[in-house]
């Protein structure tokens, strides 16, 4: 997967890797990963950091080396393609283009897809995705809903 990256991308990722690799030993530890993530406003637990490292740690060293980091970044870039698909899907649901999906818009699209839903079922779908409780689904809520499927 990492072999699909351009030289420019690889050198950008090398730079990013160096930012993570605080002590310059060629690997990223959970401690280093945590430091960088906290500097980006995230607050991962030790277990989450370990999971992130284990996901790409192919040689079982408990750390991420540069080839493993490239694999991780290549995966993330592939995932961003699906982000474009999610944006497209949101636009399909958001008939009036106001940035929100209302119950009526959701019902309309589901009916067009051949799903016969009761008002209660549509309301339930909205309720499940509607994190801020305003009765409609905004883009962030839609992304969360799609990513959790």
From Swiss-Prot:
List of residues that carry N6,N6,N6-trimethyllysine: 116
Keyword Aminoacyl-tRNA synthetase set for record: no
Lineage start: Eukaryota, Discoba, Euglenozoa, Kinetoplastea, Metakinetoplastina
Amino acids binding Ca(2+) 1: 21, 23, 25, 27, 32
Species of origin: Trypanosoma cruzi
Keyword terms: Calcium, Metal-binding, Methylation, Repeat
Annotated PROSITE patterns: EF_HAND_1, EF_HAND_2
Record's protein name: Calmodulin
InterPro entries: CALM/Myosin/TropC-like, EF-hand-dom_pair, EF_Hand_1_Ca_BS, EF_hand_dom
Gene3D superfamilies documented for this protein: EF-hand (1.10.238.10)
Domain EF-hand: 8-43, 44-79, 81-116, 117-149
UniProt similarity note: Belongs to the calmodulin family.
């Amino acid at each position: 997967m990492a072999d699909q990256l351009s030289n420019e991308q690889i050198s950008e990722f090398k730079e990013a890797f160096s930012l993570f690799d605080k002590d310059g030993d060629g690997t990223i530890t959970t401690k280093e990963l945590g430091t960088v993530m906290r500097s980006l406003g995230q607050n991962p637990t030790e277990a989450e950091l370990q999971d992130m490292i284990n996901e790409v740690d192919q040689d079982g060293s408990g750390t991420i080396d540069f080839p493993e980091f490239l694999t991780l970044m290549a995966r993330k870039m592939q995932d961003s393609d699906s982000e474009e698909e999610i944006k497209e899907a949101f636009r399909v649901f958001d008939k009036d283009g106001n940035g929100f999906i209302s119950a009526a818009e959701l019902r309309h699209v589901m009916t067009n897809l051949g799903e016969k839903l009761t008002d209660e079922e549509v309301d339930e779908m909205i309720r499940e995705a509607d994190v801020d409780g305003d009765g409609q689904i905004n883009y962030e809520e839609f992304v969360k809903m799609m990513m959790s499927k």
